[in-house]
Amino acid sequence: MPHFYAICLTILGYCVLASCGTKSLSTTSLSQIQSDELNTRKASIVEKLKENSQLPVQERIALYHKLKKENSALYDFANETELTLYAYSFLWENNLTDAIPLFELIISEFPTSANAYDSMGEAYLQAKDSLKALQYYGKSLQMNPDNFYAEDVIQKIKFPNLKPLTAQEKFSKIYSQKDYLEDLDQLGKKLLATHPHALKFITKDQFLKNIENKKSLITEKTTYPEFAWHCNAIIASIGCSHSAASTMQNDYHLFSLLPVANSFPLQVRWVNKQLLVVNPMNNSDKVKVKDEILSINGIETANLISDISDHIVAQAHIETHKTQHFNTYFAALIPYALGLPNTFEIVVRGNNSSIKLDKAKEMATELYDPSINSCSKDLCLEILAEKTAVLTISSFNYYEWNNYPIFKSFLDSSMKVIENKKIENLIIDVRYNSGGSQYPSIYLLQHLMDKPFIYYAKAEFEGKTDKIYGEEMVHPLEKRFKGKVYFLIDGNGNSTTGHFMSLVKAHNLGTIIGEELGSNQFCTAGQTLFRLSNTKLVVSSANNTHVSTATTLPDEKGILPDFFVTQSIDDYLNKVDAVKNYALKLIEK
């Protein structure tokens, strides 16, 4: 396995989505039912090995084989990912004595897995055994020609003096027209072959026309970043939030490549169909806060934003998600949409003459809306007056194999406080929650549901051998919250947040306030990475499908609020949380 990020991408294929159902309760207690549910699921063989961590590694492996022979129905022996993470836990500690035998076990158990050989190659590379590293990386590449990481490591071992292009060199790199055209064709074919629902939100005819259109824009002077921008539009056209050109961890990601001097030198915000200055940066002598930009370099703002929107990936092309993305990465998106100009000239309302802006001295990207400041962490509980509490859940990124106990402990303690304080009104804020594991989502629902439910209607991914958590009946907790619930949502809500809120909507668990969520009950997730042959552009494509049981909701829209409330520009500038304030006013009525 190349590195931790790649591991996380693999995990995503196994940890997403949901489904609901009802069943009348018998006289059996809920705690007993939940215990029985746990007993019907296969136990983790890795947890069993961890329980015997005092044993030498060979004895743990012997225990593995013994249990597989004698108790194969009791333990889950099909979870390659969990076993791989277990082996990596030793590799990350540089404990090669344990790591290498465990990777050998994985290869013997999953002989057709290219990833197993890749992981062993990494272990031997860390052990400074280049010959064995080459052997295993070579085998992995042979089994999976798309394993570009193995390809790169092999090159580094064989040619240690070979240096990759710097970000600056890549930014100005020009490939041949033939290389670009071949890569555009490859991109289209790989997306159609890899993505399980590439044509759900676009026809095949239109998808192929988009590729031909981008091919017509290629010239002898097209640079790599301009080509990558074209690729963004092709990928965005399929309407999947889990597919994108390159990754943030890649040195050649478009945002990483862009020199600061080429970035847009104002902090701006797209609000209510207006592009407004919120921070002049080093151009305070030329523009002021709240100036409305009508055009940039002669391009009308509305047309510019429309073009940028076509290059932003979003589930089902949901506009609120695209807007939130723009308001975060405007400093790079504007230059790419304008063809990477050296200078920027703007026209603002009330001034007919153009204003030439000074070059940026720092990147003006803003990751979070400062007006939403109730919680500085992913998880927090705030007790307000009048028997009201705010539970902020800005991430479901808590996985059973890693940090899920943190989420569970937080929610358990928070619900205990809510019970002791006799809270009657609970505001659950899932704004900025881009998703994560189904485990925290289901556990939160168990505190809110008043009847049994199924989380997933569909969970499809390669290598699936059994039902995953959420496909069978889940029961509410005995001590669930029984007061009024209010949910705050925004366009940032993605992936698992869509599943969570779809069930909230379908089961009428409370009042929803905010803007259209950036996702819904339908999600194509997971990640398959591939690299275009000539330009080496890295692309991540979704490779699995997860759908919650809220299947009567439309797939073409995000989860809609009961009350549409958004931040105005004055709310933003004055740090007023209009969405939360609206919820509090509803509670006061």
Tell me what each language-model feature is.
Residues 435-484, 488, 492, 526-531, ...:
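Gly/Ser/Thr-rich loop/hinge elements
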